[in-house]
Structures are given as structure tokens and as C-alpha cells.
């Protein structure tokens, strides 16, 4: 019962689509005929064209031909099962989809060439206008300088060698211009406050408060000191590298000193009664502890006038 109603509703829409299709076909046909006439007359030179565009046009033309053949068979009531046009349409559609990334890469160059051929010049906002030119890197001598250099070459062999060296100018890059350090005292104080806040958030007091009021399971470590933790991570990385590369790495004197210093810092007992400064989190002014800002030792300079005592040889 519903089939005749569906067919009647499809007839009106099909007639409208066929009229629109006929109008579009007539417009495209007129445009193609005009373009073909210009090409045959030699107005447009197609000898040095892109083979990629030619292949793409041929594929689109074959796709439209098979599609129109398929529409004709479907309109005549023939069965489309096993139709050879369907397989060709699938094959051409697959090739066109594979060509899409290549088309996107060549789109900018093709548009630029077409625009240059039409207008005869590049646009002002073209990014290739701002590319570096190697010719600008070579120092261009004036005609007077060239004449003077030629006159100096004719005087003597020595002067000729000097002028030859002077004529081949080398590119000298410009020196960096010193920039004024315009950081204000307020910005410097803000950076110092942010640094103090980061130090306070990573302090042992805040870490213990988090562990006390947090619902997460307690994390137990062998060594909680940051120096020991960092040293253990470096040792583990060294062991993994040696085991994977089958190579034994040597330890320098500096690394040995750092290990001894880290073990000494972790074994000190003065940190039992030491609490980190968290005044930066409460709105106060953070101050540096003595441990954070140690006093530098002065280097002992050799006194003048003293001579090294030599050893007497005993006979």
C-alpha cells in the first residue's frame, strides 16, 4: 500500500533533480567547449603541464562516465548486481582518495603558479617573499672600489696578492646588540617569593601534613632525604645502562665527592630539630636559612716574599 505513495513522492523530486542536472550539464558543456576552443587555438600552452593534474582529470572523467552509465541502467530497471561499473567506481574512488594527501601538498604551489600566471606578480603577503637571499650575504663592492683594487693589482706582485685577498670579502655576521636589563625590583621580589613558595611546598613539614591528613595509603621509603633519593636514582640509571650496554662506566673524582657529601648530609643529626620555612605560604616574608645560604670560604692566597724551602741533600 505504501509503495505507490512513495513512488509518487519520488517522481516530483526526481523531476526537479533532473531539471537541475540538465541546467548544470549545459553550463559545464558550454564552459568546456569554450576552453577546448582556446586550447586548440594555442591560447593556452599545455605542453609543460603537471602530469598529476592530467591523471586526476582523467580519473574524474572516467568516474563520471561510469556513474552516468550506472544511473542509466538503474533508471531503466536493470539489476546492478555484479555490474562491472560498480567495481570500476570503487577502484577509481580508492585511487582518488589515495591522491588526496598529494593534492593537499601541491595545492599551495599550484595556486601560486596560477596566480602568478594571471596577475604576473606575487602577492605582498606571500611567505616566500621573506625568505633569505644568499646574494644579500655577499658584500657588494662599488665600481670605484673595484677600479682601485685593479689598479693596486698592477703595481706589484705583493700588492696584487693583498688586493686579491681584499677583493674576496668574507661574510661577517653582525654582533649581538646589548639589551638593557629592565627587570624591576617588584618583579625580582615576585620571583623570589614564588621560589620560596615552591621550596615551602616541597618541604618536609608540608609533606608530613599531607601524609597525616590524606586518605591515601602511606608510602614507606628507605631514605626520605632528597639528596639520597636523587643519588639512588642516578645509581639505578647507571646500573641499567651498564647492564643493557654491557659496559662498565668509570666514576670520576667529582662524582665520588658528591656521593660522600650526600651520605654525610643524610647522616647529620642537626636536621632533627630543623623545620623548613613555610612563611611564604602564610603571607609572611620568607627568609633564607643558614644552610640554604652558606658562607663561602675565602681562598688562601700565597704571601709574597716567601720562598719555598728546599730539601737539603744529605751526604
UniProtKB/Swiss-Prot annotation:
InterPro entries: Sas10/Utp3/C1D. Residues 7-41, 181-203 form a coiled coil. Residues 295-315 have a biased composition (Basic residues). The modification N-acetylalanine is found at residue 2. Residues 41-174 are annotated as: Necessary for interaction with EIF4E. Keywords: Acetylation, Cell projection, Centromere, Chromosome, Coiled coil, Cytoplasm, Nucleus, Phosphoprotein, Repressor, Translation regulation. Residues 123-190, 212-243, 284-315 are annotated as: Disordered. The modification Phosphoserine is found at residues 121, 142-143, 204, 214. Expressed in testis, ovary, spleen, kidney, hippocampus and cerebellum (at protein level). Expressed in testis, ovary, spleen, kidney, brain. Residues 180-190, 212-225, 232-241 have a biased composition (Basic and acidic residues). Belongs to the SAS10 family. Interacts with CPEB1 and EIF4E. Part of the small subunit (SSU) processome, first precursor of the small eukaryotic ribosomal subunit. During the assembly of the SSU processome in the nucleolus, many ribosome biogenesis factors, an RNA chaperone and ribosomal proteins associate with the nascent pre-rRNA and work in concert to generate RNA folding, modifications, rearrangements and cleavage as well as targeted degradation of pre-ribosomal RNA by the RNA exosome. Its dissociation from the complex determines the transition from state pre-A1 to state pre-A1*. This is Neuroguidin.
